[in-house]
Amino acid sequence: MIITLRTDPPDTAHQTLVGFCAPCPLPYRIVRESQSGQRAYLFEGDFRASLEFSFHFAAGTGTVKTDEFADFDNAYTRLAGDLSEFLALERPACAAGHGDDDIVAAVARRFSYGGPNPDLARPATFCGVRSGNCIDINTALLACLRAAGRRAAYFAGLHFDQNRAGSRADGMHCWIVTETAGRRCDWDVAHCLIAGLARPVAGLNPLGGVRAAFSHGRGLVFETAKARLPAISHFARPRWLLADGSLPEAATSAVLTRPMQTGADSRHPAQTATLVTRSA
């Protein structure tokens, strides 16, 4: 018997989870995240063969139903080092004269887009410009926003570079959401860097395509009736629950089986889509 932990995607301003289909019969238990109340499923079964899980999404209503700004205070979100020196802003980042966009732009200037950088697994200031992937960039950005006293949330999920049936997403993607004075903004600094933008712009999908969020927060801790599971850095793809209690990430491939209907602004995905994830 093998156990896998699979998240229940949240409802956000841009998406509403309509339905979720799992292979039947497949016994499961529902577990909840300790800080945010997010829900996940512990499935038990024979996973030696690939299994398909389908997620059906509709457009978001603009009203956020989940506590996306729940404060995850842990090693993945606390900044080590001097914030002011790192951002190199004329005034402290917490000053009223700075918008969230100033902090986002200051962090973006510290990065070039590249592969994963193991030196940036935990948020810390550094000198010069470093190469990193979306996780590295958003780890620093989230920690800087928190250190500046701003409301910020980290989302992990999937990005499909083309909005058509058959489009695949073999890896995960992540982005940041801020909210100040009632203004909510989505930030994908990694894609802005890839696009060669001189300054990050607010909004989803600056490179086009569509995305789906599968969790929010860093260092998620799910609890069963008998135990607390180890903290999960970010949760987009399913995890194996091994006998030693560890939660390694599963190998998956996601397929967009129906295109999302989008309006004139392709940064905001809408309507209904179906995602099928194959676990290896």
Predicted segments — roles?
Residues 1-59:
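Intrinsically disordered, low-complexity N-terminal segments that are enriched in acidic
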Residues 1-18, 215-280:
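Alpha-helical and coiled-coil interaction segments, frequently adjacent to or embedded
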Residues 47-78, 243-260, 264:
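Secretory-pathway-linked proteins and extracytosolic
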Residues 70-129, 148, 254, 258-266, ...:
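Secondary-structure boundary elements
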Residues 1-12, 123-135:
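N-terminal short leaders/motifs
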Residues 2-5, 13-21, 65-67, 86-93, ...:
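Structured N-terminal alpha/beta-domain signature
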Residues 139-230:
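Hydrophobic/aromatic-rich core segments of domains that either
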Residues 103, 130-145:
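Active-site nucleophilic cysteine motif
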